[in-house]
């Protein structure tokens, strides 16, 4: 009945309840009007009193069962069930007293029905401890009204028994007057009572069994707990007591006609605080301090935004030209300084190498002269490509194989140490042109080399051959087999190299150490040529694998140098023609240059005075270097020109090998009409990388001066005392051509 309020009126559903109420009230009324007066006189006045009390009890329970809320659960709101409606499973199991009970999802009310709850199809509500929907009371029988329904059945049964019994007593005393009104009304009441007595008594007996067993009509009909244990039973007495004497369950829905505003203060709501200062304890690396912070929302949000939007500062942008100026005036002292010169970088950059912050590359001053070999020989580029791919990146592309050698002088943090190049070029001329000459058997060769110190480059930390330009390979560069040791003479190490990522002095450590263990070194051209032995280009290419480069680790200067190489290609070709033309006009082959007079070591050994095998002409000997001594000048004109075979050249390919095998080296005068490809090509840079520090610079006494001090005593790789030596060839210094390279570096080329 209560659920009919606010809904559409349906008269059909009130027919059963109206019939039941009419029969109940009408039969009892007729009984009291026509039968009870005689029973009061004949039997006892208690009879009408008893029937009246029972009738009131029946009527009260009937009213309670009809109009009372059975225990309807409120439906879920739209915003409450929108997340669970489609994703929720149909059933969910819960454990009650160790027994699994299944709960079903209600698609109408949008929640899982509690145990013993069911959705009434007539009322369209989920009812707690749903028993059944009774049409005679027009209400669902649930937890809250089952007691009254059960008492109604009991009292109605008792009332019907009393009305039928007292009516039968009245009829038996009035058999001779059956046609009388009082007897006829009593017979009608007895018929109605008897007619409904059988179903009411049957229903009452059924519910008495359910109450005794602690079940509901729904559980009994659907067969729940039929083969198992009912977790909700309390025993017979406990079940009856629970039904008849338990407190009334609360109501879950409010009466729509009564909307009572209730002010609820949940305990989890905190009172509003004023804008007072709150002491906040901040832990900063073990130091605790109290900071007064404003509790305002704007200040807190500002702190959050600041912490979120704050990004680590970017590393300083490298200025190529400013770094060149600073590198010209700096020395190894800044590299060996105890104070770090690198700026503080954030965590995301501190594991990446910083390029250009430490002066590891020294460029030429304008007063120094650079003599370059400009013959367009692809072999020079081949050796340039094999330039220590472990200490700095190999950036030569295959289509640049024909580019001249001076591309290595581009302005880049990874470029060569040009001072060391000029100071050791004369020693390379002696060694490279004599690589295939047979060394003297009993002579012990001594090489003045700058090998990385054991503490700096340990074998365990060296990277592999195919290592990329990573941070580990930059700090611990390894030495390739072809670089650290001569292939023709495995026991003789070649000149060391200077890694651009470590100071020069770190590589000078073992120079005095080698001088202590070795005797006086011999400076015979034969020994130097054997010390710098050569390999065939095929074996060198097979031995060397291309080194992958991680371009994301390269600096901006290196990436710019790659783009600028194409621009210099045309300029190099023009320079190549001019230099080659002047070189062909030269007439003297300087082949046996010795070391300067000021070299600190002792005189040459006797081995240097033995007969010198035939040597090959080199274009490096044609450019920029006067003969050192009159002895060497006189011996240069008496040398025998021997043919160079293809096995002594590192730079010949398939067709070039056959041509050079048949070609004899002649004077540049006789070769002036030959094509540029047939000109003998200098292997001065064939085996040693141009970045190697010269033997002259590394063979000094343990007292190491700065690079600037050494550079002031040398011009074009010679000492100042020898710079004024008259040239053996008048046409050697006919003109000087200035070339400006990348980064403002000026090169003077003697042609």
Swiss-Prot record:
Principal cellular location given in the protein's record: Golgi
Active site: 134 (s-palmitoyl cysteine intermediate)
Residue ranges annotated as Cytoplasmic topological domain: 1-13, 63-148, 207-751
Subcellular location: Golgi apparatus membrane; Mitochondrion membrane
Biased composition (Polar residues): 633-651, 669-681, 724-733
The keyword Acyltransferase is annotated on this UniProt entry: yes
UniProt protein name: Palmitoyltransferase ZDHHC8B
Originating species: Danio rerio
């Amino acid at each position: 009945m209560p659920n009919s309020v606010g809904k559409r009126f349906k008269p059909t559903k009130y027919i059963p309840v109206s019939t039941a109420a009419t029969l109940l009230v009408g039969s009892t009324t007729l009984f009291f009007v026509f039968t009870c007066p005689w029973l009061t006189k004949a039997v006892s006045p208690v009879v009408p009193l008893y029937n009246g009390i029972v009738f009131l009890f029946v009527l009260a329970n009937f009213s309670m069962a009809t109009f009372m809320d059975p225990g309807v659960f409120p439906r879920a709101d739209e915003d409450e069930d929108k997340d669970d409606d489609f994703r929720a499973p149909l059933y969910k199991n819960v454990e009650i007293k160790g027994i699994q009970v299944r709960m079903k999802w209600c698609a109408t009310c949008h929640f899982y029905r509690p145990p013993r709850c069911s959705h009434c199809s007539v009322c369209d509500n989920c009812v707690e401890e749903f028993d059944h929907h009774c049409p005679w009371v027009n209400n669902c029988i649930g937890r809250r009204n089952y007691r009254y329904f059960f008492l109604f059945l009991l009292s109605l049964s008792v009332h019907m028994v009393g009305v039928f019994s007292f009516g039968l007593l009245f009829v038996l005393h009035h058999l001779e007057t059956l046609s009388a009104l009082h007897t006829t009304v009593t017979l009608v009441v007895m018929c109605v009572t008897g007619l409904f007595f059988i179903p009411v008594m049957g229903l009452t007996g059924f519910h008495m069994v359910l109450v005794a067993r602690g079940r509901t009509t729904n559980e009994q009909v659907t067969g729940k707990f039929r083969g198992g244990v009912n977790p909700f039973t309390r025993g017979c007495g406990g079940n009856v007591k629970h039904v008849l004497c338990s407190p009334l369950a609360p109501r879950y829905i409010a009466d729509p006609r009564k909307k009572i505003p209730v002010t609820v203060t949940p305990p989890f709501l905190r009172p509003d605080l004023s804008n007072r200062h709150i002491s906040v304890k901040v832990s900063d690396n073990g130091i605790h301090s109290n900071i007064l912070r404003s509790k305002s929302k704007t200040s807190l949000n500002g702190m959050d935004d600041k912490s979120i939007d704050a990004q680590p500062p970017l590393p300083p942008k490298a200025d190529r030209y400013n770094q060149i100026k600073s590198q010209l005036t700096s020395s190894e002292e800044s590299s060996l300084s105890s104070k770090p010169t690198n700026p503080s970088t954030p965590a995301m950059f501190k594991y990446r190498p910083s390029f250009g912050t430490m002066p590891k590359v020294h460029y030429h001053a304008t007063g120094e002269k650079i003599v370059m070999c400009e013959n367009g020989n692809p072999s020079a580029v081949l050796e340039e490509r094999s330039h220590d791919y472990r200490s700095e990146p190999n950036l030569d592309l295959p289509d640049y194989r024909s580019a001249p050698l001076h591309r290595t002088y581009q302005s880049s943090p990874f470029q060569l140490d040009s001072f060391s190049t000029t100071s050791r070029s004369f020693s390379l001329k002696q060694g490279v042109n004599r690589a295939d000459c047979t060394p003297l058997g009993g002579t012990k060769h001594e090489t003045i080399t700058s090998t990385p110190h054991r503490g700096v480059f340990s074998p365990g930390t060296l990277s592999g051959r195919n290592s990329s330009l990573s941070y580990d390979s930059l700090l611990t560069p390894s030495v390739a087999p072809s670089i650290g040791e001569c292939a023709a003479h495995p026991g003789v190490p070649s000149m060391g190299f200077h890694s651009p990522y470590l100071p020069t002095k770190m590589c000078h450590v073992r120079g005095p150490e080698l001088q202590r263990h070795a005797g006086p070194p011999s400076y015979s051209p034969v020994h130097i040529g054997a010390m710098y032995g050569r390999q065939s280009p095929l074996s060198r290419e097979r031995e060397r694998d291309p080194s992958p480069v991680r371009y994301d680790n390269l600096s901006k200067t290196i990436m710019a140098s790659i783009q600028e190489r194409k621009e210099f290609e045309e300029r190099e070709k023009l320079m190549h023609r001019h230099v080659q033309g002047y070189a062909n006009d030269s007439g003297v082959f300087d082949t046996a240059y010795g070391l300067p007079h000021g070299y600190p070591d002792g005189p040459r050994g006797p081995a240097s005075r033995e007969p010198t095998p035939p040597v090959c002409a080199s274009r490096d000997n044609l450019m920029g270097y006067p003969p050192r001594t009159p002895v060497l000048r006189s011996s240069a004109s008496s040398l025998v020109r021997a043919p160079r075979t293809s096995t002594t050249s590192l730079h010949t390919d398939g067709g070039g090998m056959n041509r050079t095998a048949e070609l004899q080296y002649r004077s540049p005068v006789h070769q002036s009409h030959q094509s540029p490809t047939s000109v003998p090509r200098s292997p001065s840079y064939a085996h040693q990388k141009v970045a190697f520090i010269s033997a002259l610079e590394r063979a000094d006494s343990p007292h190491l001066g700065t690079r600037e001090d050494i550079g002031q005593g040398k011009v074009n790789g010679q000492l100042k005392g020898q710079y004024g030596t008259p040239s053996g060839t008048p046409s050697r210094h006919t003109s000087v051509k200035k070339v400006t390279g990348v980064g403002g570096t000026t090169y003077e080329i003697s042609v």
